[in-house]
Amino acid sequence: MILKDKKVNSDPLTETGTPDVCQKFNWNHHSPSQAAYPDGNFAYRYWFTPQDVRRQFEGNANMAAGVAINNAIQFRLAEKIWKLNPSTKKLSPYDHTPLEHDVAIQKVQEEFARYKPVNEKDVLKFNWYRETIPSTISQLEKACELLGVKNQVIAENVLSLSDPRLLLPIIGRSDLEYQLKDFSSLGSHIAKPPFGLLEIKTSHDRPSRMKKDGTYSFVNAKVPTTPSRQHLLQVAFYKKCKPDHFISLVYVVKDDFKIFDKNNCGDLQDENLENYYEQLVTIFRRRERLMLRYAEQTDKDKIIKELVQDLDPQFDHNFCWSIGSLFVNDAKKLWNC
């Protein structure tokens, strides 16, 4: 197993009291995005692998493009952006002056250009996405304009919730929060509440087959007809933290976008979001109970050996082990695969 001692704790999300066995693994909070991973993969990522090593996991061009597009809309619209303060090692809001469209695109294109593809297929996607990122940003801007995202826009706000059924807090970060001063385009049905929260999801074309000229064709990404369960779990947490906010979920591709809210999607109605939040808590309670089985153990390596016997790593999962062969092989050694 790949380990590296951490002498200085620079994670800003570590200020709550945690059980001793959780502290052994530097596990101090739950995150809605972590619920997407099966328990075995989650354990390898967040229990067995230290944060500084986890940051070495391979990414992919899809993720890098998604970050670029999200950053662009923040640069375009946000008046405050939450970032890590290098002095205090804590997340803090920074004032931000919105940028013009072309300036924002140029800035994120420069950031995306620094991404290093991890294999030949990733090179294909990287080169293609350099061309499609601007049009995807334009689609997202249209969606934000329709939603009225322009007043008091805050990006990457830190949301924290302590559920009495859990030992650890749930912590997440919202994409955009904003004041709904001019929302007549959405109709009278949202005369209240005056604040909105927007979760952004991007999808990207994927390479298909090689053409006669040696280049590759790409399959166009499409917006979904319904939101995914994982994304509903995320926005359910945001709704729990911000019950008075009008929640929207937007899917964006290079030539289209689709906005879901409680008026066109039953899953986003308040009572159904409450049900999804309960599903999220169930996942987190299960993981806490699993870890607390070893509350009296003092040997971390022994705990890990016991945990892997209780968890299915699901190495055939379609995305969660896309972390690089070095780390996949390390995990397979743990599970004796």
Give a label for each model feature.
Residues 160-162, 203-205, 253-257:
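Short, solvent-exposed loop/turn segments at secondary-structure junctions
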Residues 227, 241-337:
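Metal-dependent nuclease catalytic regions and adjoining charged, substrate-binding loops involved
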Residues 169-171, 190-195, 257-263:
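Short, mixed charged/polar active-site loops
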Residues 1-174, 178-182:
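Metal-dependent nuclease catalytic cores that hydrolyze phosphodiester bonds in DNA/RNA
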Residues 1-19, 146, 186-188, 299, ...:
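Glycine- and charge-rich intrinsically disordered segments
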Residues 154, 178, 196-200, 246-251:
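A structural signal for short, well-ordered beta-strand segments and their strand-loop junctions
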Residues 181-186, 221-253:
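Metal-dependent nuclease catalytic cores in nucleic-acid-processing enzymes
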Residues 69, 174-221, 237-238:
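Conserved catalytic cores of phosphodiester-cleaving nucleases, focusing on short active-site segments
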